Structure formats: C-alpha cells, structure tokens
Amino acid sequence: MSAKTNPFFVKDALSVEDILDELMGHDHGEEKDEHVWLSLKNAETLVTAIADALQELDPDNKDTYAANASAYIEKLSALDGAYQSAVDGAARKTVLFGDRFPFRYLVDDYGLSYYAAFAGCSAESEASFETVSFLAKKVDELGLPCVLTIEGKNHKLAETIVRSTAGKNQKVLTMDSMQSMTSKDAANGATYLSVMERNLSVLKEALD
C-alpha cells in the first residue's frame, strides 16, 4: 500500500551535511526525499551556510551578508513559529494527500501525521483501486475536511478520492512545493516566504 502514515519525526533541523546527503540521494535506509527546502528549519540552516560561504568569498562585504542573513532568518523563525502555533491549536493532526507527497520535512517539523497516494519523489500518477479506497476510508474515519494536492493542473486523483468518501463533500486544496516555480512567478512577486505563508493558510484549513 503506497498510502502511509508518517514514518518518523525529526525533532531538529537537518545539518548542512544531512541536507546535502538528501539532495545527492545518499541512502541511509530511509526513503529519500530531496524536498529539504519545505522545512523552515532546514531553510534557516541553508541561509546560514550560504551566508558563511559568501563571507569567505567576499570578506570585504561580510558584515552585509551577516546582517542580511540574520534579518532573513528572523523572518523564517517567525513563520516557523506561526506554523507551530497553528498546529498546536488545530483540531486535527493529520493531513491526507491525493497526490505525491513532498512535504515530509514540513509535517515532521510539527509532529503531524500524513497519508498520501505516492511518495514525494514518485513518478507514479495512477493510483490503484486499493489506494483510492484506503484513502477515502481514512478521510471518512478521521473526518477530514480536505484532500490535499500539490501544484499542477491535474487533481483528478484527489477528486476521485472525494467522490469515494461517504459525504463526497470535502474540499480539494493545493499546497505549493515550489518545484514548478518559474521566473515569471518570481517577477510577479512570488518568494519563498510568500509561498510558505500561502501553504500555512491551506494547512490551517486542512487541520480545522
């Protein structure tokens, strides 16, 4: 069964070495997931590492790099706190994706459980009858108000799961993994922080 609950919880952010291992696909006996940027805690680690590298390359401007990194990390930390507060006050602690699941690091950060049709790096797009049935029953069992998807135009699987539930009235909501971000999106004002803020709004609704 490809649908599953959260296999483990990560209490602390990954180190730079851990993040590089994930990005390079090194196998530690766990399912690999390169979507490390979807953890705000990991993002703080990455910003620090980038700032340190820039200061070594350009020591004349090290104070500027340090100040910029500090200001950005403060914003990341504030948003991280907003996520934690939202989860702490939520009625539910489980999300269900009728799609691939690239948000493992995010749910691990806040102690959430999850069910998903496919792993985050899966190339699959067609779920079996058993998977659809399993996920629909979980929606009913847990009283979930939403079935989540990732960005993209094809949400047919999530819609099929909803049609297979008893109530057939759950919303299909989208969280953005930023895998499809374009230069046009950036020109229109999309940033890492703005996307993660939108994801927080969706998560709040899914956990309500």
Language model region names:
Residues 1-208:
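Extracytoplasmic metal-acquisition and chelation regions
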